[in-house]
Amino acid sequence: TEFEKKLYIARVQTEKILSDDEVFYIPSLSSKVISYKGLIISDHIKDFYPDLTNGKMKTSLCVFHQRFSTNTLPQWKLAQPFRYLAHNGEINTIQGNRNWYLARRNKLNIESLPELNKLHPLISRTDSDSYTLDNMLEFLLAGDMGIFRAMRTLMPPAWQNNNNLNEKLKACYEYPVSYTH
C-alpha cells in the first residue's frame, strides 16, 4: 500500500540521516509487521511484551528466534528476527551478492518508489549475511513484488541444469537473474 511505502521510505531516510549512530535502530515501522526484540528467554516473552497476551492482538504468523548472530559482534539490529526474516546459518555467497547489488543498484529503480532510488545503497557491506538478505527482501516487497516471487528471486532453486523443467517455468526463473546475479 502507499502508506507502507511511505513508512519504508521514512525509515530508510531516518537510518541514512542517523547512520553514524551505532545504537540507533528501528526494529520495524509498518502497519502490517511488528518486530519485537529482547534479550530474554522464550518463557518470559509474555512478561517482557504484555501486549502479546492481549486477546485483541491477532496475527496469522509469528516467528521467534532465540540467539544473536554468531559471525558478527552482537548488536540490536543484528539480533534475530529481522523485519521479515529469521535465518539461522551462513549464506556462502554473501560477498558476491553484495558486489552484485552494488554493480547493479542503478538498474534496481522502482518506479513506484522514486524517493527511494536516491537512497542507495540499501544493502550493508558489513552487517550479517541474514541482515543483508532481509534488507533486499524488504526492498523488493516495498516495490510491490509479492513475498513468494521475492523469495524465489533472492533464493532461486537450482534449475539451470534441469532438463525436465518446462519452458514457462524456466523463463520465470531466468527473468530475475538480470536483477539478482
Question: Where are each of the predicted segments found?
Answer:
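Conserved phosphate/anionic-ligand binding catalytic regions in large, soluble enzymes, centered on
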Residues: 81-98
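Active-site pocket-lining segments that scaffold enzyme catalytic pockets across diverse folds
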Residues: 1-71, 80, 164, 171-172
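Conserved small/polar residues in nucleotide/adenosyl-binding loops
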Residues: 180-181
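Short acidic, glycine/serine/threonine-rich loops at helix termini
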Residues: 73-78, 95-99, 103-107
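General structural feature for long, well-ordered alpha-helical segments within catalytic domains
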Residues: 59, 64, 78-81, 97, ...
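Alpha-helix capping and helix-loop boundary segments enriched in small/acidic/polar residues
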Residues: 73-80, 123-127
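Conserved catalytic alpha/beta cores of large enzymes that bind or transform nucleotide phosphates
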Residues: 92, 99, 106-162
